[in-house]
């Protein structure tokens, strides 16, 4: 269990077959959050026990080591992509530059970037004005459209951190999202500013090990506001509004807070 921000976070799976009851002593704490998954009817899972099976102890230690190390840029759980596209580009102001065009069926397993940055103001401008745009399989609209800094999980400017899928190291920014496609992936950089920017991008990909049909495309969009909710939902704020099937993988929320300190604890719905 990690201790930080005046709390503890435990990610150890606690399986149960029929029910799970959680109790706490009086004055135990002031805040808690439990995340659980309900499996389809008929699924069999082992009941949790504090006595770990001998073969599970080293596996648990391996996960602990990886999480404690914050990964640091290497995609885990996938073999390294056999193909790497490296591009160094100068993107003039108010222009779009084609970075790479990949033929499918493949999946992108990592995107890494290096951007020369100046002072704090220059960082904030460059990483918000440069946008990553990716279009899969000839679709009419890009599936990925996001300022470069926000795509790698940092705003405003550069804020050093590392986690499982995104972050930054001395070598630059990294994002290890898996992005499958059937026929074609077009990767572009858009400069919404008026100053030319130099960017180095590395795109790692590998062939699909099964047909693309049914996989779905990776989507990443940035916005300040979406459709307003009815008055009885105030002050809720919409992070995502979409239709169809898919999986929600995560969100990077950047708050311009004019009132000083803020816990950042949300009531996500």
Regions found by a protein language model. Give the residues of each.
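Beta-strand-centric surfaces of beta-sandwich/beta-rich domains
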Residues: 1-269
């Amino acid at each position: 269990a990690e201790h930080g921000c005046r709390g503890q976070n435990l990610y150890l799976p606690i399986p149960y077959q029929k029910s799970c009851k959680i109790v706490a002593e009086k004055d135990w704490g002031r805040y808690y959050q439990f995340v659980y998954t309900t499996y389809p009817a008929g699924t069999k899972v082992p009941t949790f026990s504090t006595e770990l099976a001998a073969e599970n102890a080293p596996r648990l230690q391996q996960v602990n080591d990886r999480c404690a190390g914050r990964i640091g840029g290497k995609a885990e759980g996938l073999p390294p992509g056999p193909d790497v596209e490296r591009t160094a580009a100068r993107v003039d102001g108010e222009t779009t530059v084609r970075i790479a065009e990949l033929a499918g069926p493949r999946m992108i397993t990592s995107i890494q970037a290096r951007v020369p940055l100046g002072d704090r103001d220059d960082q904030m401008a460059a990483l918000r004005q440069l946008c990553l745009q990716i279009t899969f399989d000839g679709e009419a609209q890009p599936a990925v459209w996001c300022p470069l800094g926000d795509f790698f999980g940092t705003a405003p400017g550069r804020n050093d951190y590392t986690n499982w899928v995104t972050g930054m190291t001395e070598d630059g920014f990294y994002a290890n999202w898996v992005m499958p496609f059937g026929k074609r992936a077009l990767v572009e950089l858009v400069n919404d500013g008026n100053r030319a920017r130099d960017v180095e991008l590395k795109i790692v990909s590998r062939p699909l090990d099964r047909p693309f049909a049914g996989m779905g495309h990776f989507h990443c969009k940035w916005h300040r506001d979406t459709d307003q909710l009815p008055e009885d939902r105030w002050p809720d704020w919409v992070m995502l509004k979409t239709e169809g099937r898919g999986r929600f993988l995560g969100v990077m929320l950047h708050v311009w807070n004019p009132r000083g300190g803020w816990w950042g604890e949300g009531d996500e719905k």
